[in-house]
Curated annotation (Swiss-Prot):
The keyword Transcription does not apply. A lipid is attached at residues 3-4 (S-palmitoyl cysteine). This is Guanine nucleotide-binding protein G(q) subunit alpha. Guanine nucleotide-binding proteins (G proteins) are involved as modulators or transducers in various transmembrane signaling systems.
Length: 353
């Protein structure tokens, strides 16, 4: 019997070693998932970024997926026109074509959240309204009320969108606005590593739900809409949107949960900034700006500096990119750089070497 003991011990040792190896494998496999938390205020472009990941690194959008967006595109058109019709009254702007007052009343009576079709009377009314110089003046003053960024894109495309065989394009899907409520996760596989992107609602009422997402975050991806420097909040019409974004960024980067998470700052909507800066001057909203007017590159560098200076930790690097979330090639290029940054920072932690 005594001679068997060493063999039993050997077998026990072998089993223990195998268990240890399996535990290490499990730990390694668990760590091959990177959690990327998308944060930012409402309408900064987080949901559009997720859609781009689906197009670039996922299955994309089938014809059935595209068809499921038809009524949401219709609703976005009605929602935009509703906002402008209301603003015509509040801003005291007159329709140039008197018939458009009646068209406005007709569209106003339709609850845009229940729209599922796009009938000819509505199509004709919306086209007539959009071509009215009064509505165009109202559109030019859009910073004085709440209007979605995609309003012009859709209203310029009403004839195409109203066709019976209409199938939304990828650009139509990217630009559609549906406020994120709750938490949306989108996992995708890249080079045998799972990137789990988590999008949370940006409006104030949604932010209390973020706390559940804070564990094991590899990287914070914080989106800022560059074009919001002259806009006010949906929730409060006397608070500047960019100031709100700065306050949120300051809070996020000082959270103890994110002490070991890398921070990547996306200064988004650079295309809208380039349009807007020609007639809306940054210095009117941020008096400390001393650069030239009508120069987008100087304006965006100033905005970047404002955010980077909110970082209290001199050892923490804020990685930054200027983006246009509706431009697939731009996001493809930027995310390739982001992926490399994240992997470089996590080589040892995630057993990638």
């Amino acid at each position: 019997m005594a001679c068997c003991i060493p063999d039993e011990l050997k077998e026990q040792k072998r089993i223990n070693q195998e268990i240890e190896r399996q535990l290490k494998r499990d730990k390694r496999d668990a760590r091959r998932e990177l959690k990327l938390l998308l944060l930012g205020t409402g309408e900064s472009g987080k949901s559009t970024f997720i859609k781009q990941m689906r197009i670039i690194h996922g299955a994309g959008y089938s014809d059935e997926d595209k068809r499921s967006h038809i009524k949401i595109v219709y609703q976005n058109i009605f929602m935009a026109m509703h906002a402008m019709i209301r603003a015509m009254d509040t801003l005291n702007i007159q329709y140039i074509n008197p018939a458009n007052r009646e068209n406005g009343n007709m569209i106003r009576q339709i609850d845009y959240e229940t729209v599922t079709t796009f009938d000819k009377p509505c199509v004709d009314a919306i086209i007539s309204l959009w071509n009215d110089d009064g509505i165009q003046e109202c559109y030019d003053r859009r910073r004085e009320y709440q209007l979605t960024d995609s309003a012009k894109y859709y209203l310029d495309s009403v004839e195409r969108i109203s066709q019976q065989d209409y199938l939304p394009t990828l650009q139509d899907i990217l630009r559609v606005r549906v406020p994120t409520t709750g938490i949306i996760e989108y996992p995708f596989d890249l080079d045998s590593i799972i990137f789990r992107m988590v999008d949370v609602g940006g409006q104030r009422s949604e932010r209390r739900k973020w706390i559940h997402c804070f564990e094991n975050v590899t990287s914070i991806m914080f989106l800022v809409a560059l074009s919001e420097y002259d806009q006010v909040l949906v929730e409060s019409d006397n608070e500047n949107r960019m100031e709100e974004s700065k306050a949120l960024f300051r809070t996020i980067i000082t959270y103890p949960w994110f002490q070991n998470s890398s921070v990547i700052l996306f200064l988004n909507k650079k295309d809208l900034l380039e349009e807007k800066i020609m007639h809306s001057h940054l210095v009117d909203y941020f008096p400390e700006f001393d650069g030239p007017k009508k120069e987008a590159s100087t304006a965006r560098e100033f905005i970047l500096k404002m955010f980077v200076e909110l970082n209290p930790d001199p050892d923490k690097i804020i990685y930054s990119h200027f983006t246009c979330a509706t431009d697939t090639e731009n996001i493809r290029f930027v995310f390739a750089a982001v992926k490399d940054t994240i992997l470089q920072l996590n080589l040892k932690e995630y057993n990638l070497v």
